[in-house]
């Protein structure tokens, strides 16, 4: 194997597989006369050009960069209503769910303490409450048939909407 430092290794062969040994030898290289090698400047070796007035920067680096540059190039006007609106504090989904569920539990406890029956009650975010709202939002001209009856098992009053 040849390494960057110029050393090569080779494994000496032996009849016994238990013993392992390596021999390290230096490769034969002809020395380079660096005075005869022409200098070729690479872009990575050239520093910023220095003038009588100081270091000259290219135009792109001199200009201040902005995160809005791509938007300005595309001529997209930002929505200033959103830009100047105060940022609301972050509330995690876990906290939102916790407050929503605690509100539902408190509502249930208050109903039970007041002597009411919770069997026929639907929560605000259940599908039974959401679907009629969505249908009404789609078309106000839909006829609504409202049917109220008492549940035989629980005795709760149930209202059924038909569109």
UniProtKB/Swiss-Prot annotation:
Top-level taxon in the UniProt lineage: Eukaryota
Organism: Drosophila melanogaster
Identification of the protein by name: Uncharacterized protein CG45078
């Amino acid at each position: 194997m040849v390494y960057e430092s110029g050393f090569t290794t080779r494994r000496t062969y032996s009849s016994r597989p238990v013993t392992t040994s390596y021999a390290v030898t230096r490769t034969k290289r002809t020395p380079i006369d660096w005075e005869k090698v022409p200098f070729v400047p690479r872009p990575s070796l050239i520093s910023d050009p220095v003038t009588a007035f100081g270091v000259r920067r290219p135009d792109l680096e001199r200009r201040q960069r902005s995160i809005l540059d791509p938007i300005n190039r595309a001529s997209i006007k930002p929505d200033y209503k959103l830009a100047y609106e105060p940022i609301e504090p972050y509330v995690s989904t876990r906290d939102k769910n916790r407050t929503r569920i605690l509100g539902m539990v408190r509502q249930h406890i208050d109903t039970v303490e007041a002597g009411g029956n919770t069997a026929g009650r639907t929560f605000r975010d259940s599908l039974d409450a959401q679907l009629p709202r969505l249908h009404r939002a789609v078309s106000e001209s839909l006829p609504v048939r409202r049917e109220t009856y008492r549940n035989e098992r629980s005795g709760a009053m149930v209202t059924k909407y038909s569109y």
